[in-house]
């Protein structure tokens, strides 16, 4: 099976520098032209540089996904540049962490507005563009493990991610008569693999798989004592996914091979979500890392 997105145009929101950038690169490596949206213009430009460095074609877009005028301007820019939109990945969100007893309404509303309005606006207006051009497109919303399970300190994030899980199912039903598929993807603490991001972290003296968290005396010991955590011990396959792993899956989900898949959620997490909560994987029995099919030429050069 040779997955190809040749001739297709994709738009990825929240395109930098971690999950969004990885998805954008993957769609490009599988043949799509990719428009990269981010609230921070430099982040969108960095995602496009990564695409172009690997031989792809990208377009940098800046805009607030929760503002309808910005969304319409982004879609118009893609249509003007390439004449069509086949794929949309709704990745933009605000990872705002706070305890329910500490959260304020303004911050709660902001987190909800960015994620929910952003998914609604891009899904609606991209679908209109697809229908007008008789395109049977693919729309993917990026969720989180917090959509399905509770974690202390993520009240706003869990609320909007959980809500989006059902938004996807409802949107899938609305758009099915037009041949437009709507699905979701649930990351689970992915390990960053963007060479530019990792280089910046090294320059800042970071050595962990994930960036340090601020000290919080009210949080569990793994947070309180080190400010970081390592999730590998809770993953049955012993290794967290990367944005590259996520990108491979979303590229396939956006291809014609997935033509009848809609209203579904996909997860690439080494078995983390399927794991019984009390089960701790035996690290000594782990088979070891499965070889990764890389997408970034810089990663190939470094390896």
Regions found by a protein language model. Give the residues of each.
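Canonical Rossmann dinucleotide-binding motif of NAD(H)/NADP(H)-dependent dehydrogenases/reductases
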Residues: 3-35
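C-terminal substrate-recognition "lid" of short-chain dehydrogenase/reductases
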Residues: 4, 120, 181, 237-268, ...
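Substrate-binding pocket helix/loop in short-chain dehydrogenase/reductase
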Residues: 99-100, 104-112, 231
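Active-site helix of classical SDR
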Residues: 123, 160, 168
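Alpha-helical segment proximal to the catalytic Tyr-Lys
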Residues: 128, 132, 173-177, 259
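Residue(s) in the substrate-gating loop at a strand-loop-helix junction
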Residues: 144
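Short C-terminal tail/terminal secondary-structure segment
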Residues: 251, 262-303
């Amino acid at each position: 099976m040779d997955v190809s997105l040749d001739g297709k145009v994709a738009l990825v929101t929240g395109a930098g520098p971690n999950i969004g950038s990885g998805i954008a690169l993957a769609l490009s490596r599988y043949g799509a032209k990719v428009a990269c949206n981010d609230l921070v213009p430099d982040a969108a430009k960095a995602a496009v540089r990564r695409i172009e460095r690997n031989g792809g074609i990208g377009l940098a877009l800046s805009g607030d996904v929760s503002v309808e005028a910005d969304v319409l301007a982004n879609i118009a820019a893609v249509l003007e540049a390439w004449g069509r939109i086949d794929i949309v990945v709704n990745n933009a969100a605000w990872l705002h962490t706070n305890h329910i007893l500490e959260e304020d309404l303004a911050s709660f509303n902001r987190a909800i507005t960015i994620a929910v309005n952003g998914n609604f606006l891009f899904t609606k207006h991209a679908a209109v563009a697809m229908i007008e051009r008789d395109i049977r497109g693919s729309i993917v919303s990026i969720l989180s493990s917090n959509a399905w399970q509770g974690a202390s300190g993520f009240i706003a994030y869990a609320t909007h991610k959980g809500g989006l899980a059902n938004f996807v199912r409802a949107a899938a039903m609305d758009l099915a008569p037009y041949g437009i598929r709507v699905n979701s993807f649930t990351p689970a603490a992915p390990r960053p693999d963007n060479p530019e991001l990792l280089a910046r972290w090294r320059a800042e003296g970071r050595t962990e798989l994930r960036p340090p968290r601020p000290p919080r005396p009210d949080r569990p010991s793994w947070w309180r004592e080190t400010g970081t955590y390592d999730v590998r011990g809770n993953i049955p396959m012993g290794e967290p996914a990367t944005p590259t792993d996520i990108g491979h899956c979303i590229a396939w989900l956006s291809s014609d091979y997935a033509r009848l898949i809609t209203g579904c959620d996909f997860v690439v997490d080494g078995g983390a979500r399927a794991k019984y909560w009390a089960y701790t994987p035996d690290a000594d029995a782990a088979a070891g890392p499965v070889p990764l099919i890389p997408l970034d030429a810089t990663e190939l050069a470094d390896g």
